[in-house]
Structure formats: structure tokens, C-alpha cells
């Protein structure tokens, strides 16, 4: 069970909720803070104090005073008018993360919602009712207005949701679970949609999956080293300690661990003096990507516990301040940085694929073909990898350097953070497929070398994937193999699978 406080949520807890469907509840203390904040809003309405978003219009309409009798209609209008998202929906795990993160943000007690609003968010989460939320339409300031409006619709029993494997009207799923829709009161519509939870939710999913893929990329690279009879000396601890980057040292340690006991690796001067960079510099390149992952993790763990609403209510209502915590610039920067880190794992992987299939660079059959000439073998797999890598370079263009004014220039600088997160997710999918191709090629290469000569850990990886992708004995439709391998990489419980050495403070 994960207990939300608004302050202590971790990425490990988010992972358990997203991928293991762990039950989520709100702490008693946080709900008490929510109640105090709500009383402040009700007093503002009763006393007819003018406060943005409670009894005024929104954006450029912030100077329009709303009559007391129209305050609830204001919130209803807000959600419906702002539900302007278009395009394909976010993956279900992202929608699920948005429910979790919005509930956690509201539990900080600075937003002025009733406890029932948070309870409904958690009801949907625990019942696995995931709002259908279009991916396109957010500028990343004033928060993720359009995506979160589609989330809010589900609380009202409107819009569509994913439920039990189907896309159905929200009211149908709520009725099936005995969950009553809510009616929004003063400020609650704004509190639901004024935040960074779309970009952050997708960012969290990208981080969690990229972390696993980074580990996997090292084991795949280790098998490639075996397939190419690579030189193990380049991974000696002394080399990496003198540079001083913890992540680089740890990657080298994991490569040594994966290759322990291998009869396929070589020593300096045995076959050649040194390897190409795509083999020799694995710790330096992969380690640099880990540095970015660590940076992104730090930013995400702040943002998943952040108050990103506007206005914010302090000191029991004594202070109600309009600020800009909804601005997604920190996450936009983090996701743009993440795009580069993930893309680079694909870049170096594609170069290793080339070394596996190019007969001018190895002593293996051309393109790993069982009958070169008659059969093309892995030739076009390298084309696919090159295409995916090239597409990644387009996606890696920073979204955060762009800004288009909106709301009649009231919102004159925006983050485009959700675009950055979406592109990071696209790069992640491409990179996983590139690594799947490398794994397929590496498995074929070690077969030519003799599987019995592999290290125990790389052989375990080989045997697991051979259960879903057979050896290349003749040409076939390799697209299915690539997708099956990519799905396996996404779904396997990696640290336990190969007892991967995880980061420590040994080299801090």
C-alpha cells in the first residue's frame, strides 16, 4: 500500500502503483490540511472577497468578477471549455500516473479543494479507471490545462475512460464500480487542471522505463563484446576510477560482471591492440547517459511532490497568492536533456550493430547470414536501426527553446514541457527497438562463436530471448522478432533477472 502525504512520494512508490497496481490511500494528516484549505475558500466565497479563479474569470478574463450564484457554473464551464486535447491518447500508465500525481499535489493542502475531490481521484486509480486523455494540446503553462481537463471530465462522469481493456464512457465505468460522479465547487475545477501533471506523469514513465533500458543496454552490449571478441582490458576498474565519474565506474563494473567467466573476450594484443569506440567507450557513453538519468530523477522527485496550482492558499487562508508554479520549465529542461541521453544509447547501439553485420569489420558471416547472397540475414535490421536513430535525432531537438504567447498575451511565455515529455517517450520506444535489434544480432554472433563459451550471465540472457526469437537459420519476417524482443525488454523484471549490480555510494 502507498500512503500519500503530498510530500513524501518516491519514484519507487510510483513504479509500484503504475506497474503492480498497488493500492493508494491518503494520509489522515494530509486530509486534515485539505479540509483547512477548503474552509478558507468557502470563507472567501461567503465574504465575497475577490480572488483569482474562485470568483473571477480565467487567463485574460481574470479581471471579470463572477457573481456568487455563478461560481459553480464557472468551474463546470472551465473544465468543458478547456477539454480541447486532440490526437492519440496517452498510454494508460501515463493516465494512471496523472491521477496519482494530481491527488498527491492536492494533498499538500494549498489548493482549496474538498476531500471528496481527492477521494474520487483515488477511487478511479484504485478501480483502474483511467481517463482517455489526448496527448496534444498543452503548452506546459498555465500547466497542462487541456490534458488535465480531460482527466477532470472523468470525475464528473463525462468523457471516456479505459476500463477492463476497453474504451468506454466514463459514466459506464463509474457505475460498474459504484462510484458517484462529483459536482465541482468553487476553485475545484481550476485546482484540478492548473498543474504540470501531464508532462510529469509522462516524464516519470519515461524515466522508469529508461532506467530499465539503460541497464539492459549494458548486458546487450556485453553480449556484443563477446560476439566481436572484444577486449576486456578497457573495462578495468583502474581506467575508470582515474576519471572520477561514479556512473562510468559503475557501468564498467556491470560490464565486467556480465562478462565474468567468458571465453569469448580477449586481451590487449591477443587479436588486436584496441577496439573501436562503440565497444571500448561503453562505460564513458552509457555512464554519461546515467548522469542525465540521475539529474532527471532528482527533478522528478521534486515535481511529484510539488504544489503547482494557482492561486495557492497559505496560513489557513490569510494569504492567497497568485504565482506561477504551474510553469513547466524545470520538467521541460529535464525531458529535453533526457531525450539526448536515451537517443545516445541508440546511437552507440546502432554502431555496434554495424560492427556485428559488416564483414569488413569482423570475421563473421556477412550480415550474419546463414547463406550469404542467397539469404540477406540481418542486413535490413541495420537499416531499421539507422532509421530509428535518425528519427530520434529529429525528436531530440529541444522543445523547451520554443514559446508561443497565448490567452491574448497574458500567458506570454510557456514551457512546451509536455511536448518534450512526449518526444522523450517516442525516443524511448525507438531506442528499445534499436537495442532489440542489437540483441538479436549479438545472439546470432555468439552462436557462430560457440554459445558454450559465453559468460554465465550473458548466456542466461541469450537463453531467455531464444525462447521467443529463434536462431536465424533462413530468412524470415524479422519485424516480428524485433517487436517481440522489444516487448520482452519492456516487461522483464530486469534487476532480478540478471542480479544486476545496482548503483552504490562506493565511488561517490
Swiss-Prot record:
Which top EC class applies here?
lyase
Any one GO MF term held by the record is:
histidine ammonia-lyase activity
- Asked if the record carries the keyword Cytoplasm, the reply is yes
Mod. after translation: Contains an active site 4-methylidene-imidazol-5-one (MIO), which is formed autocatalytically by cyclization and dehydration of residues Ala-Ser-Gly.
**Catalyzed reaction equations:** L-histidine = trans-urocanate + NH4(+)
Annotated positions of the 2,3-didehydroalanine (Ser) modification:
142
Family stated for the protein in its record? Belongs to the PAL/histidase family.
- Which HAMAP family does UniProt cross-reference here? His_ammonia_lyase (MF_00229)
Q: What is this protein's name?
A: Histidine ammonia-lyase
Gene this chain is encoded by: hutH
Amino acid at each position: 500500500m502507498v500512503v500519500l502525504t503530498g510530500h513524501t512520494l518516491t519514484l519507487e512508490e510510483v513504479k509500484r502503483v503504475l506497474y503492480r497496481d498497488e493500492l493508494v490511500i491518503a494520509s489522515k494528516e494530509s486530509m486534515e490540511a485539505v479540509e483547512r484549505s477548503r474552509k478558507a475558500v468557502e470563507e472567501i466565497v461567503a465574504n465575497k472577497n475577490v480572488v483569482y479563479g474562485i470568483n473571477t474569470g480565467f487567463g485574460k478574463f481574470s479581471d471579470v468578477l463572477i457573481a456568487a450564484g455563478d461560481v459553480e457554473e464557472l468551474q463546470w464551464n472551465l473544465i468543458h471549455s478547456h477539454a480541447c486535447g486532440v490526437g492519440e491518447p496517452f498510454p494508460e500508465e501515463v493516465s494512471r500516473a496523472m491521477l496519482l500525481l494530481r491527488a498527491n499535489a492536492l494533498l499538500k493542502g494549498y489548493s482549496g479543494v474538498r476531500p471528496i475531490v481527492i477521494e474520487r481521484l483515488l477511487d478511479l486509480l484504485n478501480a483502474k479507471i483511467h481517463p482517455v486523455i489526448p496527448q496534444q494540446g498543452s503548452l506546459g503553462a498555465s500547466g497542462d490545462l487541456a490534458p488535465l481537463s480531460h482527466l477532470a471530465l472523468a470525475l464528473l462522469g463525462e468523457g471516456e475512460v479505459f476500463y477492463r481493456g476497453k474504451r468506454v464512457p466514463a459514466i459506464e465505468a463509474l457505475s460498474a464500480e459504484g462510484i458517484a460522479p462529483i459536482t465541482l465547487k468553487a476553485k475545484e475545477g481550476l485546482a484540478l487542471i492548473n498543474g504540470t501533471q501531464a508532462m510529469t506523469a509522462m516524464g516519470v514513465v519515461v524515466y522508469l522505463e529508461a532506467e530499465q533500458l539503460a541497464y539492459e543496454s549494458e548486458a546487450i552490449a556485453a553480449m556484443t563484446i563477446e560476439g566481436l571478441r572484444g577486449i576486456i582490458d578497457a573495462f578495468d576498474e583502474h581506467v575508470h576510477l582515474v576519471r572520477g565519474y561514479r556512473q562510468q565506474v559503475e557501468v564498467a563494473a556491470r560490464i565486467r560482471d556480465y562478462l565474468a567467466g567468458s571465453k569469448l573476450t580477449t586481451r590487449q594484443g591477443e587479436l588486436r591492440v584496441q577496439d573501436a569506440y562503440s565497444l571500448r567507450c561503453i562505460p564513458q557513453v552509457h555512464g554519461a547517459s546515467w548522469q542525465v538519468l540521475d539529474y532527471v530523477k532528482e527533478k522528478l522527485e521534486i515535481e511529484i511532490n510539488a504544489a503547482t496550482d494557482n492561486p495557492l492558499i497559505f496560513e489557513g487562508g490569510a494569504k492567497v497568492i497568485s504565482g506561477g508554479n504551474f510553469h513547466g520549465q524545470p520538467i521541460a529542461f529535464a525531458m529535453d536533456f533526457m531525450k539526448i541521453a536515451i537517443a545516445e544509447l541508440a546511437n552507440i547501439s546502432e554502431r555496434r550493430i554495424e560492427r556485428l553485420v559488416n564483414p569488413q569489420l569482423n570475421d563473421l558471416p556477412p550480415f550474419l547470414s546463414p547463406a550469404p547472397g542467397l539469404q540477406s540475414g540481418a542486413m535490413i535490421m541495420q537499416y531499421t536501426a539507422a532509421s530509428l536513430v535518425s528519427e530520434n535525432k529529429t525528436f531530440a531537438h529541444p522543445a523547451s527553446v520554443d514559446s508561443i504567447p497565448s490567452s491574448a498575451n497574458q500567458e506570454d511565455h510557456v514551457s512546451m514541457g509536455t511536448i518534450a515529455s512526449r518526444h522523450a517517450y517516442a525516443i524511448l520506444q525507438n531506442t528499445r527497438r534499436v537495442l532489440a535489434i542489437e540483441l538479436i544480432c549479438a545472439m546470432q554472433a555468439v552462436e557462430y562463436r560457440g554459445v558454450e563459451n559465453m559468460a554465465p550471465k550473458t548466456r542466461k540472457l541469450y537463453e531467455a530471448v531464444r525462447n521467443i526469437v529463434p536462431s536465424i537459420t533462413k530468412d524470415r519476417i524479422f519485424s516480428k522478432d524485433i517487436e517481440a524482443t522489444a516487448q520482452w525488454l519492456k516487461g522483464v523484471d530486469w534487476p532480478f533477472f540478471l542480479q544486476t549490480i545496482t548503483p552504490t555510494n562506493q565511488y561517490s
